[in-house]
Amino acid sequence: MDTTKQVVVDLETLSTHANACIVSIGAVLVEDMEITDTFYINVDGRTCKEAGLHIDPDTIKWWGEQSKEAQQAWQQNPVPLQEAIDKFTIWYGRESIPIWGYGANFDVVILESAYRALDMFIPWKFWDISCLRTLMNVLDKRLPKSNNHNALDDATAQANMLIEILKS
């Protein structure tokens, strides 16, 4: 695997469905085994709902049980879904590079669902999608415990784990 350039993405959502409403996107660019850039944006959940994305009452309840800091983090300066996806696409670029999520059926799948809901071009190829959780399970690795639920903090922790694994 060419490890020179990778993107790790983490989302905070209002559902666990594949077409979940996204409330924040955090991403980290890893180049030559170092974090070289980050991306973070909060998304207006109403615009996700308007785009047909799913909101789950159980997930809303779960968020209500999280810390005030976690709840407030994704409510600060949210932008419409279209703007968030546009900005993420500009940040990611048009060149398909490996993109990692923490779960084979979560972050990248949900992000792709948002692209499709907006009828937008997905900038990565399906073969560039990888699952960090699967890799960690095979290698018996664990992320540091965190209840932060901040997309950028989580993406950074995951990127650091990816770097550790790729260096070993």
Model-derived segments and their meaning:
Residues 70-74, 118-124, 145:
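Short, polar/flexible loop-turn hinges at active-site or ligand-entry regions and domain interfaces
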Residues 71-72, 89, 112, 159, ...:
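Non-transmembrane alpha-helical segments in soluble domains
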Residues 18-20, 115, 162:
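Short, function-defining helix-loop hinge/capping sites that tune catalysis or transport
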Residues 2-7, 12-101:
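Conserved non-catalytic scaffold segment of RNase H-like nuclease domains
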Residues 10-12, 107, 131, 154:
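Acidic active-site catalytic centers that drive phospho-/nucleotidyl reactions
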Residues 123-142:
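Short, flexible loop segments at boundaries between secondary-structure elements
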Residues 95-104, 109-110, 140-168:
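Acidic, Mg2+-coordinating catalytic module of metal-dependent nucleases/exonucleases
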Residues 92, 105-126:
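Substrate-recognition/cap helix-loop segment adjacent to the acidic, metal-dependent catalytic center
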